[in-house]
Amino acid sequence: MGLNAKSVCSTSSTEPNGSIVTTAPSNGEVSSSIVVVVSSSSISSSSDSPIAILPHPDPIPSTSFSSASQRSEEELPGTSAASRTDEMCSCDSQNLAASTAATSNGNKRKRRLSSDSNEDPELGFEPPSAKRQQRLPALYGSEQGNLSSVASSVYTSPVVSVDGQSTQELLSIRSSPAEDLSEAPHSPLPDSPDSPPSPDRGSKQTPVVVRYAAEQVVTSTVVTQKTEDDDLLDDSCEDYSYDEDDEDDVEEEDDDVEIYSSTISPASSGCSQQQAVNGERTPGLPKHQEQIHHPVSDLMINMRTPMSPAVENGLRQCPLPALAWANAADVWRLMCHRDEQDSRLRSISMLEQHPGLQPRMRAILLDWLIEVCEVYKLHRETFYLAVDYLDRYLHVAHKVQKTHLQLIGITCLFVAAKVEEIYPPKIGEFAYVTDGACTERDILNHEKILLQALDWDISPITITGWLGVYMQLNVNNRTPASFSQIGRQKSAEADDAFIYPQFSGFEFVQTSQLLDLCTLDVGMANYSYSVLAAAAISHTFSREMALRCSGLDWQVIQPCARWMEPFFRVISQKAPYLQLNEQNEQVSNKFGLGLICPNIVTDDSHIIQTHTTTMDMYDEVLMAQDAAHAMRARIQASPATALRAPESLLTPPASSHKPDEYLGDEGDETGARSGISSTTTCCNTAASNKGGKSSSNNSVTSCSSRSNP
């Protein structure tokens, strides 16, 4: 048959079912082809694999062979086709055996990697990026001329088990350490498993490394060593120190970060050069875009933790009416939370860390600031903002000198005016009222220090803000029976007139006078602003109104109302008559604002700060506080002194209420006895002169009995 003059050339191809077909054609009239079929199911760790030799149905012309086959004819004359076929099969068997051993070894490592992972995949688990298969060019362990059409499309997740087809595809992939592989940009289009490799992507292209956030770095061509896996899975060797805010940020990132497919579209091919760094799921996205901080979420998380006894008793009942622009319950909850949070930034012991300052110095400074506000017609809100800034600054600062206290006070008023006023005074006006003690440059320099100490939080809800809300609720006649409608926001009718002031300005100023006097005392830092406003309403109006408008329990308001009682007595006796002429002209038109709120207060003179309190009034309050403190200490030392017996009941008086003649010392007993003896002598003399009168005898007897007990 002329087989001696013919050469045997074999080609191999991969079928869709995962089988490798090796064809050995021969040139001649009677040509025979040897097809080696290797089944994927027969691949195991053993070296003996079943090989089937099938005849090729169609002859292949000799012109299809390369010049290498012609050279092999000349070099090997006289070689039989059968022997060459056996040699070819043996070579292929050796290559397949070596590849099978490497593959089985890699499979064991992959299974070990899968078993070491913390989270086992459930049945039917499919990772997100498996929807679009990634192209992973292979590095062939054998000659590329023998296996040139093997294409691999292997998913790189460590938790996906390797099936038969992927095992067969892994035959052509050599096992190499991760350091030898370099990263390459992704292919813009996904490849089909059956499609041949394109000319521009040869076998020399390096595989793609895909990284996942907070997971192990896994590649299809690299089997990570056991020691490296243990280091990645075990975090006990590293120390992590997280804040509460950092933990919140990590939880938000885990929930909000989206898993993007590693296959890049043509539209985003310009970003394909950026590789995944630091475990980012999306290589093209910057790191700062993933780390998004949500202050609203932090606020809602912090609201779950109670911060004061008022919150521990339960949530405050919302007295607000239905609002068209927001949910009333949410608005009230945020207001209460902000008030509790701001109350922690102040303390009654704020002056203990300043040895050179006294509480009276703070009172003098605030009284001077009230006078400045009245001169420049600043709002009450401006003054109370300055008080808040001053107390918070003294709470965080250390060793403030008394010569700098006026500079701190005028700087607080300067910042508050810029926050609240529409037309704040110039900085030269603030420097002028200090009479040369502070310059403009000093105020500007200290403004930076003040804002840094306050952490740029300069918009709290002040006392006058809470007072306006409470009085507005009182005008709207909000009752506890109507509070339940807040839960049904859709069914409740929105009250658009609530945001416009409708209360009496005269009553507002009366209550503000009491709060102005209370502000001079450092004890106000013991209570939150909402509690202070509610306690003031309980004195000027009634306890029921304070409870209804504030939503607080009386157990929360009572300590503040008891502390405010001497201030109320002094302000009721010493306060001048309020010369406040309200010019509240009713809106005549029946459209626009007049239709929405017909009882609107058009005169805003009540919001201008007035100087109606003096230091003399504050001194009287201090004297009343000292007297009350002394009485309280006396009652605690001897509780019986507070008892008063009825007039009809004859009981001996208490020891503290006895006359002074019965409270003599032991040294005075001799004098008292000498006086008694002289009285007895006089009585005896008188009795002897009268000659036995019964009255004198009785007196003598009584005197002698008293002198000799």
From Swiss-Prot:
Residues 1-30, 43-149, 162-205, 221-289, 642-709 are annotated as: Disordered. Residues 187-199 have a biased composition (Pro residues). The modification Phosphoserine is found at S114, S115, S117, S129, S187, S192, S195, S198. Residues 677-709 have a biased composition (Low complexity). The keyword tRNA processing does not apply. CDD domains: CYCLIN_CCNE_rpt1, CYCLIN_CCNE_rpt2. GO terms for cellular component: cyclin E1-CDK2 complex; cytoplasm; microtubule organizing center; nucleus. GO terms for biological process: cell proliferation involved in compound eye morphogenesis; eggshell chorion gene amplification; G1/S transition of mitotic cell cycle; neuroblast fate determination; neuron fate specification; peripheral nervous system development; pole cell development; positive regulation of apoptotic process. One of its GO terms (molecular function) is cyclin-dependent protein serine/threonine kinase regulator activity. Its main location: nucleus. It comes from the Eukaryota. The modification Phosphothreonine is found at T651. Keywords: Cell cycle, Cell division, Cyclin, Nucleus, Phosphoprotein. The keyword RNA-binding does not apply. Isoform II is ubiquitous in early embryos and, prior to mitosis 14, is rapidly degraded in all cells except the pole (germ) cells. Expressed during G1 phase in proliferating peripheral nervous system cells. Constitutive expression in embryonic cycles lacking a G1 phase. Residues 228-258 have a biased composition (Acidic residues). It is found in: Nucleus. Belongs to the cyclin family. Cyclin E subfamily. Interacts with a member of the CDK2/CDK protein kinases to form a serine/threonine kinase holoenzyme complex. The cyclin subunit imparts substrate specificity to the complex. Interacts (via C-terminus) with Z600 (via C-terminus). This is G1/S-specific cyclin-E. The gene is CycE.
